């Protein structure tokens, strides 16, 4: 089987939506019956985004095999059925790390190690490896054409197109076509200069995606085609839309998938986008709305919680309600009190690290528990719920996590000291271990209690969810907390770790150590988020009586 590659680049400015465009195109090709995957090549020096600040980089998306990756991989999984893995995302740092390791081993037999050919060859090898077994692979190059950091990646894909043959390679370039109100027209010059920059490094784009706040007129697309040496039918207008799930239909309506299939000589049926049409219909025709408060520490950049926000919206789709998300800084709860949590239909505390704002999260969990407000805690959101219950119900004064107070009297949350590494070997860790790549990561099995709420929601006794954490419930103190009324609703496959807790005498109080947001999609939703939004809707109706 021959694999075809579409290399996706961006020009003029960053944040044009390369990831959404690539994912939308992949969704159309998948709807035509093709086996599609998407890769993201990031030009930063970090080995992976695992230790990067969420305020700088946004969320870290965790794959089933435990890779800490760019948030764009979350978009990919929400648009196509193919699951991402560590093969789908790599960085400059990862490439250099691998090349330097080989150099130290003597693999290069004393040769002078250079960007060309050693770095570019390493990039090409990873791209080809990631594409194995697929009909079409979309490869998104992070950054903007012209950035010095992107040059090795651009050179590598230029070479790769020659290696595999131009009949199996396409270059798709996203570019900004701004509208100037003073002139009353869109301007094509930035696009022309962006293509000129690409040409200077040996890449002639085959497709141009023109990003604008409005549809780019046919005459302007013809002008772009003429000056950029691209067929007119390959100049695609991608205007701003009120829902990202409309983009597959927008691209298909302009024949982008037909053009690509003809170029690759792929004989496949027309795309059936009925599932996406259903998503768009549900989104546009809600029967009501709810307001959910999300209490976190990185709220100045909503992308830090991208998958959680999307999963809440998916939960809304399954309940035919619009979910309004109120982002609340947990430090504001500390300084202004729980009064700022009034008038919420439900409360969610997402994952996070570090002590800043933790007491605000603990106060939030208490407020939700004592006032019968639906509560969903994720990762740290479960740990603060446990700490709150231990302090205020189980009589364990000043209970805490050893992450925040190492020598606390009641360490109800503590570091797991023994882990399985990628090869399955036992590895001992401590507070002094490296932060990067030293967490419990990826898909793990969880056994659900028969009498639990989550057992009803999932409809299965065993589930698999993705994790990203170092700290867990301390089993040494668990019996005392359970005796006070807390229910352990889910345990790890080996029965050693607490994965889900519930407060039984509460309308809806669920907290999990894993990250359910990573497996939620607009077409399928997720049982926890669907149940949570339903509980929010029911709470709103009770309050209205």
From Swiss-Prot:
CTP binds at residues 14, 147-149, 187-192, 223. GO terms for biological process: 'de novo' CTP biosynthetic process; pyrimidine nucleobase biosynthetic process. NCBIfam families: PRK05380.1 (NF003792), PyrG (TIGR00337). This is CTP synthase. The keyword Nucleotide-binding applies. The gene is pyrG. The active site is at 379 (nucleophile), 515, 517. Allosterically activated by GTP, when glutamine is the substrate; GTP has no effect on the reaction when ammonia is the substrate. The allosteric effector GTP functions by stabilizing the protein conformation that binds the tetrahedral intermediate(s) formed during glutamine hydrolysis. Inhibited by the product CTP, via allosteric rather than competitive inhibition. It comes from Salmonella agona (strain SL483).
